[in-house]
Amino acid sequence: MKLLEEFIQEKGTVLPGNVLKVDAFLNHQIDPVLMQAMGNEFAKRFQDLGITKIVTIESSGIAPAVFAGLALSVPVVFARKKKSVTLTDNLFTSTVYSYTKKESNDISVSKQFLTADDTILVIDDFLANGQAALGLLEIAEHAGAKVAGIGIVIEKSFQQGRELLNKTGIPVYSLARIASLENEEILFLEEE
């Protein structure tokens, strides 16, 4: 998606350890025009798959997921990283490792919001090692829900995440695919 690639080039910063900082439009401040365009692109790609819900992880996956949900007219469910007094039992849970935070988190979704009747689209902000998406797939499996597709905002194609997700047989679509972050230069793969 050219618009997203332009935002990444103009406003993204490469940090040590192959970390891409996109706080200016996705991970801290949100650009709603870009989010709407991304949501529409995800909807266009997955519109014929019978999606009944979109599932993501708090917090940076929420904005693109909501705009995709709006475009597809379906609810969005986000996995919580921390339990609260209102989210304590009747949960589907998985443990995921965060590449950027270098820590594991238990993520949870209430059984009330995900069932075997659902056909879901997983949306995540980044694909690096694939652990977040795999955790959401595990939650869907616990619920008996069908995962029809995985939408990724930014994929670091030089890491193993895509390879792991491809092994699931579920269609994966990334809006921007990064080939390299070497020498603080952002190089993209061609669009899918």
UniProtKB/Swiss-Prot annotation:
Leading EC class: transferase
Domain of life the protein comes from: Bacteria
One Pfam family named in its UniProt record: Pribosyltran
Known catalytic reactions: XMP + diphosphate = xanthine + 5-phospho-alpha-D-ribose 1-diphosphate
Entry's family note: Belongs to the purine/pyrimidine phosphoribosyltransferase family. Xpt subfamily.
PANTHER family: HYPOXANTHINE/GUANINE PHOSPHORIBOSYLTRANSFERASE, XANTHINE PHOSPHORIBOSYLTRANSFERASE
Function: Converts the preformed base xanthine, a product of nucleic acid breakdown, to xanthosine 5'-monophosphate (XMP), so it can be reused for RNA or DNA synthesis.
Name by which UniProt lists this protein: Xanthine phosphoribosyltransferase
Species of origin: Listeria monocytogenes serovar 1/2a (strain ATCC BAA-679 / EGD-e)
